[in-house]
Curated annotation (Swiss-Prot):
Family: Belongs to the purine/pyrimidine phosphoribosyltransferase family.
The name this protein goes by in its record: Adenine phosphoribosyltransferase
Function: Catalyzes a salvage reaction resulting in the formation of AMP, that is energically less costly than de novo synthesis.
Keyword Manganese: no
Organism the protein comes from: Nitrosomonas europaea (strain ATCC 19718 / CIP 103999 / KCTC 2705 / NBRC 14298)
Gene: apt
C-alpha cells in the first residue's frame, strides 16, 4: 500500500509558496491508518522501547497507537504552558523567532530507551528540541520516526549529521 499516495498536497498553505502535506486524508482511510501504524510498529517490534514520545499535535495521533502496540509508555511533547505539572523545556528556532516545547519532569526515567515520533520533518527544529528534552531527562534516543520527510528543507540531513538515527515512511522532494 502506498502511504504517499494517500497524503493530500495543498499548494500555498499556510503561506504562498508552501506545499502543505496533509495527513488527514491518510488518517481517515482505515487501510492507510493501519498501514502507517503497522509500518512503524514492524520496524521497532524487536527493539526494547520503554517510551514513545509524540510531538504536538499530529505526532500524538501516530505515537499513541505505536506505544500501545509496542507495550511502551506514551509521553507528549507539548508547546509551552500546556502541561499541568512541573516541566522541563527547550527553545527552538522558527523562521521568525523562537518557540518552546516541554515535557513533564517525571515523564522519562533515567535509562529509558525512547522512540520519538512526529508526522513530518521539515527543518528539524522541533525534533531537535524534543531530542534535547529526552536526553536532559536521562533517556536514550533510539530513533526519530516520521510519516513524511521533506529532505529538500534539510532537517533530516542536519539531524543525521548530529549523529541521530532517523526513519520515515515516505518522502516528498520538490
Amino acid at each position: 500500500m502506498s502511504i504517499k499516495s494517500r497524503i493530500r498536497t495543498i499548494p500555498h498553505y499556510p503561506h504562498e509558496g508552501i506545499m502543505f502535506r496533509d495527513i488527514t486524508t491518510l488518517l481517515k482511510d482505515p487501510a492507510g491508518l493501519r498501514s502507517t501504524i503497522d509500518g512503524i510498529v514492524q520496524r521497532y517490534q524487536t527493539e526494547k522501547i520503554d517510551k514513545v514520545v509524540g510531538i504536538e499535535s499530529r505526532g500524538f495521533i501516530i505515537a499513541a497507537p505505536v506505544a500501545y502496540a509496542l507495550s511502551a509508555g506514551f509521553v507528549p511533547v507539548r508547546k509551552q504552558g500546556k502541561l499541568p505539572a512541573e516541566t522541563i523545556g527547550c527553545d527552538y528556532q522558527l523562521e521568525y523567532g523562537y518557540d518552546k516545547v516541554e515535557i513533564h519532569v517525571d515523564a522519562i526515567d533515567k535509562g529509558d530507551r525512547v522512540l520519538l515520533i512526529d508526522d513530518l520533518i521539515a527543518t528539524g527544529g522541533t525534533m531537535e528540541a524534543a531530542i534535547k528534552l529526552v536526553q536532559e531527562a536521562g533517556g536514550e534516543v533510539i530513533e526519530c520516526c516520521f510519516v513524511i520527510d521533506l529532505p529538500d528543507i534539510g532537517g533530516s540531513r542536519r539531524l543525521r549529521q548530529q549523529g541521530h538515527r532517523l526513519f520515515s515512511l515516505c518522502s516528498f522532494e520538490d
